[in-house]
Swiss-Prot record:
Domain VIT span(s) in chain numbering: 29-158
A GO cellular component entry from the record: extracellular region
Keyword match Secreted: yes
Organism listed in the record: Homo sapiens
Annotated family: Belongs to the ITIH family.
Compartmental location: Secreted
Propeptide part(s) removed at maturation, as residue ranges: 21-34, 652-890
Coiled-coil boundaries: none
Protein name: Inter-alpha-trypsin inhibitor heavy chain H3
One Gene Ontology biological process: hyaluronan metabolic process
Amino acid sequence: MAFAWWPCLILALLSSLAASGFPRSPFRLLGKRSLPEGVANGIEVYSTKINSKVTSRFAHNVVTMRAVNRADTAKEVSFDVELPKTAFITNFTLTIDGVTYPGNVKEKEVAKKQYEKAVSQGKTAGLVKASGRKLEKFTVSVNVAAGSKVTFELTYEELLKRHKGKYEMYLKVQPKQLVKHFEIEVDIFEPQGISMLDAEASFITNDLLGSALTKSFSGKKGHVSFKPSLDQQRSCPTCTDSLLNGDFTITYDVNRESPGNVQIVNGYFVHFFAPQGLPVVPKNVAFVIDISGSMAGRKLEQTKEALLRILEDMQEEDYLNFILFSGDVSTWKEHLVQATPENLQEARTFVKSMEDKGMTNINDGLLRGISMLNKAREEHRIPERSTSIVIMLTDGDANVGESRPEKIQENVRNAIGGKFPLYNLGFGNNLNYNFLENMALENHGFARRIYEDSDADLQLQGFYEEVANPLLTGVEMEYPENAILDLTQNTYQHFYDGSEIVVAGRLVDEDMNSFKADVKGHGATNDLTFTEEVDMKEMEKALQERDYIFGNYIERLWAYLTIEQLLEKRKNAHGEEKENLTARALDLSLKYHFVTPLTSMVVTKPEDNEDERAIADKPGEDAEATPVSPAMSYLTSYQPPQNPYYYVDGDPHFIIQIPEKDDALCFNIDEAPGTVLRLIQDAVTGLTVNGQITGDKRGSPDSKTRKTYFGKLGIANAQMDFQVEVTTEKITLWNRAVPSTFSWLDTVTVTQDGLSMMINRKNMVVSFGDGVTFVVVLHQVWKKHPVHRDFLGFYVVDSHRMSAQTHGLLGQFFQPFDFKVSDIRPGSDPTKPDATLVVKNHQLIVTRGSQKDYRKDASIGTKVVCWFVHNNGEGLIDGVHTDYIVPNLF
């Protein structure tokens, strides 16, 4: 029975030991001073290399160890590697005296009999088993003749998950003896560009940090190298044992100029999604805590310490309650309460007073917490735009009340009804972790084991930090209909800050011209739609550097993700559904050479006219390219209405187009940089638009030579408590004083009652209901241009719902007005005639000219002919232009 609880991945090398009868003892690689440098027990491990290539978060790792038997008799050599639990082994090869024995992945049941036969014959074997919190240990032993060399090579792959804002790759370094050539080489390629890269080790010294470890990144490429010399490996200047014993961790993140990134290679696509700058969605948390007798002592104290830290991180918009279970169930409050300073102080007192007692009634504890969240929603005790979660901590199995795991699972599933996630934390090893994991998975959460160490409280706090900041709920990833096959999971209950959603799939037609991905979700203040478009021809150009990366990495990433998700679904499936999931996961595991819980790695080594094999199983917890350039086409659904059309663009040129006259008027405003002008104000609808002037890089005080533009715009609706500040770098939306920040490179739609805001690269469209639509255009110039800088254009394409009281430099023209142009005559410039304009009881001299309408094309624009009114529009605008200067943007 003990074996059944031992989660192990087995690799057995089925080869007999030397006929000389040399005793089979495990190889320990412990050095002695009397032996030659780098030799232990007659074996010299002269090379250990870890080579990793990471392409778009997908890591391909090769661990190679080379050894020679310096003794005059046969010796046994062991190869130990610790690899992440989330990784899949893809190959293992053994080379003895130049002859290579390759690995082959087979269905586990096919290989099982061969393995059992080998064990019964007493042949050498190795294990891969759980090793610590994040790793599994792979071990294989082989008998090596005197003077012979052996090479072990293990390959594994994994998708690096984003965790608290960065990707992490763990490598265990433990050579156990001095190694002549020891090195770790990691090459990272990210088409989005690398924003940070770091590497550190638990055993690092100043000497190693200064010369043995190098790390660098530039653009899309990053590199980490660790090559300690023999002397640098010594634990002391005269020692022969190695100080290289611990964790080697690489962390990095990528540039996120837009929330999503789509990559397509050979008919497969991957979509990475991680928006930034969004406000946190308020959360309602039911903490369901086990206080049974087994939690007594250090475990309960650590739980209290963690909960006290978590209370420090609660936001005032959050709601919470504590549900304690032992033989019975008790609660801190009858209902969820808001995390006000007063309530949090009372909660701290309650947490400190928790005492252990009695049995373990998991069923009733969970159902009480779930019921509390459901009632809070039904009785409108919590904000409408908030999200609920259940966090349960237990250290044992249910032993009172309903104790059947399958029945508890059913009760919890029915009570939650798919409305919110359940996160289960298993404290220690004396519990049914599979039960906790399965229950969490089928309720859109996950399970974590909390290890009984001195840092258990930090483990608990670390988990909470992962789910503390939901930015979106109800996330749906949508792709072209009938254009994709074999899509991985594309709906998620939450997107948490610092994480990333990854979706992959296969294209029906590889010859598509473009590919579009939409992501919809509910934010803290409004609903959002993010759009990512990829031009396939541009994508093809972007892959010209693909020799830098390994193989069809997107196809393998898709296979990895698909297998991982099929295996998760399989845990809670039954009957025919489970058989189908198993068959699909097995087929993919065999096709892509992954060692999963359904397959085994077999290494064939002919010996004594027999096929000798090595078998590896996968345990569970309980047992170079250029950036993608999406198409920048403007949302053409916004066409100019037949109504008058108004805009300001350029230096700054105000243009009033009057369709009835088949003509247009225009004027400039010359003011100093920093001046804020009132463009639109409507007291009835509550709409206001202001613009701040920015100057060119020369900073000339002479208005005749100075170029000025609008560098910042403020759009506000007082009735909706809505504000949006638009600059050339970003767009910040305040909805009821809660900010959301977007980049101009985002493709996103924000919707709520009476409001729609769409950002599509160089354009932003804001609509207030049916009848008010503004467009903001971003003009970008070469960053190193000696004079010009980026600026904004503002266009009113629909204003028929604005009131008759609307005013401002543009707003005053929203109501019908008449003008007459006469006496057209040659001007000072032969190409620009003058004329007489009669408007608003003024007779003005105007000049024929032309401006550009950039609403559809920010680069080229469309020519617009207009009559230019001189002197800051004097006579055309009401009053003088200085009447429209306001103190600030809002």
